[in-house]
């Protein structure tokens, strides 16, 4: 099979003379048409620090493609900043962006018959959006993560974006003066790169490396370091070789490799968003995978990394301690990874990890051996019960109060809940319910970092529960339960909760329960009426119409299921 197996459809033959004429205008020569066309999906943007450092990575990839005797074809992908849109109407566009990016890359690469694609992304939804596109198309591809941000510093402490969100709660409670508040705001994010803890972007990049779709060590590099540029160039070279070998994403993205990815997510204490996104990636790759698979893996994989938001360290600390290869080697030796999975380099996981030490380096406590794991089981639990028969997601490790039964404080939007929190109307023992924020109801399934961080800042993070049909940021921690499905907008049980109802969150029993009789639940369901959609035009209306339930990834192309 030729290197230009796809692009020859628009570059070969008499009938394609007009097509070639367009390429000549771009500086191509006749000899170039014999070489593969490699797309570079460049997420560079000055909207957010997560993506502001991507251009030099794209430039390195472009040059490496040329040196590898292939033709780079550069196109842009959009982004928004989750950190900037958080707590506002703009956050409704965040999950929408995942689908838009997947559609953009698929449209450009398929429309132009590209032979391979290098995806370069930074902020949270760049990650699954790009991977979904590669999995859908099954065109040789590689993911180049833009890299993590370095931590900020103030008064001897490492800072991340979550430090600022939590400072809001502390400041409003009078626990922090204005000088410290402003200093944290100004020092938390010192440069370019994605948010520094094991939040969503770093979680997904680590998982992509574990799955074999990104190069070893690349997921924990800092954006500003030169090794990140070198890694982008090497990624492009590896991709061109994958095109020549016809090594495709679906050769790599399998049920076994997704199990590897989820095992690493559990071991590193990753984001709840990974559940939603890997349901979507598996759907795109046509890999059988469901929400219960996460619980199956959680029960056998311990947490061996001490990373923010619930731990002490950030991604650059993990990198210095050996990065994802070190985590994977520990899991592989414990029989918790599939060593025979192929990776984008053509090597298996076991071959890739052959020279990685069996034990983490001494003198650090970022990565622990299995026998000294921070928690014996993973942290991302799937809860079920009469409030979420399809399942929901909670971080359950490190909770001082793993069971809470309390009165429901019911809010039909994040904005109403945030107002109540800032007005100090939430008390110890309450269970905050934020509903009509699901994929269809929001629409867009906003992340609830602002209210959860405000609760933490007010000292209520361990004593107040929060459940929502929306999502949580990778920076969220505490007694919080998200992705409740079915969502309120389609008549899910969360829509039937009334102010003051007794609600139980039980991390031990993996239970989310509304403590009323079946008869009362049935009566409320009969009386419930679906509200009108909040949007009837534009991209949010389209997403609300097309998105499926969160328990299946909230994808917009699940028409046949």
Swiss-Prot record:
Superkingdom of origin: Bacteria
Cofactor: [2Fe-2S] cluster; Mg(2+)
Pathway as given in its UniProt record: Amino-acid biosynthesis; L-isoleucine biosynthesis; L-isoleucine from 2-oxobutanoate: step 3/4; Amino-acid biosynthesis; L-valine biosynthesis; L-valine from pyruvate: step 3/4
Any single GO BP term: L-valine biosynthetic process
Positions with a binding annotation for [2Fe-2S] cluster: 50, 123, 195
Cited InterPro entries: DHAD_IlvD/Edd, Dihydro-acid_dehy_C, DihydroxyA_deHydtase, DiOHA_6PGluconate_deHydtase_CS, ILV_EDD_C, ILV_EDD_N, IlvD/EDD_N
Cofactor binding: number and manner: Binds 1 [2Fe-2S] cluster per subunit. This cluster acts as a Lewis acid cofactor.
Gene3D superfamilies associated with the record: IlvD/EDD C-terminal domain-like (3.50.30.80)
EC identifiers of the protein: 4.2.1.9
Residues annotated with N6-carboxylysine modification: 125
Pfam families linked: ILV_EDD_C (PF24877), ILVD_EDD_N (PF00920)
HAMAP family: IlvD (MF_00012)
Family of the protein in this entry: Belongs to the IlvD/Edd family.
Protein name: Dihydroxy-acid dehydratase 2
Gene: ilvD2
């Amino acid at each position: 099979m030729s290197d230009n197996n796809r692009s020859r459809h628009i570059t070969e033959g008499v009938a394609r003379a007009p097509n070639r004429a367009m390429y000549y205008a771009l500086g191509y020569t006749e000899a170039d048409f014999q070489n593969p066309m490699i797309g570079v999906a460049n997420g560079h943007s000055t909207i957010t620090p997560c993506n502001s450092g991507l251009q030099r990575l794209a430039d390195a990839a472009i040059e490496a493609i040329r040196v590898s005797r292939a033709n780079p074809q550069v196109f842009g992908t959009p982004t928004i900043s989750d950190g900037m849109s958080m707590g506002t109407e703009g956050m409704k566009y965040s999950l929408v962006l995942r689908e838009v990016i997947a559609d953009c890359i698929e449209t450009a690469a398929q429309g132009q018959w590209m032979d391979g694609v290098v995806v370069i992304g930074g902020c949270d939804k760049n990650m699954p959006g790009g991977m979904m596109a590669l999995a859908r198309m099954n065109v040789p591809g590689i993911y180049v993560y833009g890299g993590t941000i370095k931590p900020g510093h103030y008064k001897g402490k490492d800072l991340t974006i979550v430090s600022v969100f939590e400072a809001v709660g502390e400041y409003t409670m009078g626990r922090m003066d204005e000088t410290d508040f402003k200093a944290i705001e100004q020092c938390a994010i010192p440069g370019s790169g994605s948010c520094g803890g094991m939040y969503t972007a770093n979680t997904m990049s680590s998982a992509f490396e574990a799955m074999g779709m990104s190069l070893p060590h690349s997921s924990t590099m800092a954006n500003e370091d030169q090794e990140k540029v070198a890694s982008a160039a090497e990624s492009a070279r590896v991709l061109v070789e994958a095109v020549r070998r016809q090594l495709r994403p679906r050769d790599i993205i399998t049920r076994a490799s997704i199990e590897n990815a989820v095992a690493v997510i559990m071991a590193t204490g990753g984001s709840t968003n990974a559940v939603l996104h890997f349901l979507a990636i598996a759907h795109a790759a046509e890999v059988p995978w469901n929400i219960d698979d996460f619980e199956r893996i959680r029960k056998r994989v311990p947490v061996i990394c001490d990373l923010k938001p619930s731990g002490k360290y950030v991604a650059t600390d993990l990198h210095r301690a050996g990065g994802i290869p070190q985590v994977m080697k520990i899991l592989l030796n414990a029989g918790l990874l599939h060593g025979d999975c192929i990776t984008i380099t053509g090597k298996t996981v076991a071959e890739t990890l052959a020279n990685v030490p069996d034990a983490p380096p001494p003198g650090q406590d970022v990565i622990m051996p299995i026998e000294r794991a921070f928690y014996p089981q993973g942290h991302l639990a799937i809860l079920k019960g009469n409030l979420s028969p399809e399942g929901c997601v909670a971080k359950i490790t490190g909770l001082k109060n793993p069971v809470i039964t309390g009165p429901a404080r019911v809010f039909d939007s994040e904005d109403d809940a945030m107002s109540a929190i800032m007005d100090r109307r939430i008390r110890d023992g309450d269970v905050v319910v934020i509903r009509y924020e699901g994929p269809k109801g929001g629409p867009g399934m906003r992340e609830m970092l602002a209210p959860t961080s405000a609760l933490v800042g007010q000292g209520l993070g361990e004593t107040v529960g929060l459940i929502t049909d929306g999502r949580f940021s990778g920076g969220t921690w505490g007694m919080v339960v998200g992705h409740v499905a079915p969502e309120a907008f389609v008549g899910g049980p969360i829509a039937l909760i009334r102010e003051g109802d007794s609600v139980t969150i039980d991390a031990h029993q993996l239970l989310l329960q509304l403590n009323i009789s079946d008869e009362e639940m049935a009566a409320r369901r009969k009386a419930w009426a679906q509200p009108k959609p909040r949007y009837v035009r534009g991209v949010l209306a389209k997403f609300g119409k097309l998105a499926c339930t969160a328990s299946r990834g909230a994808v917009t192309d699940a028409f046949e299921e």
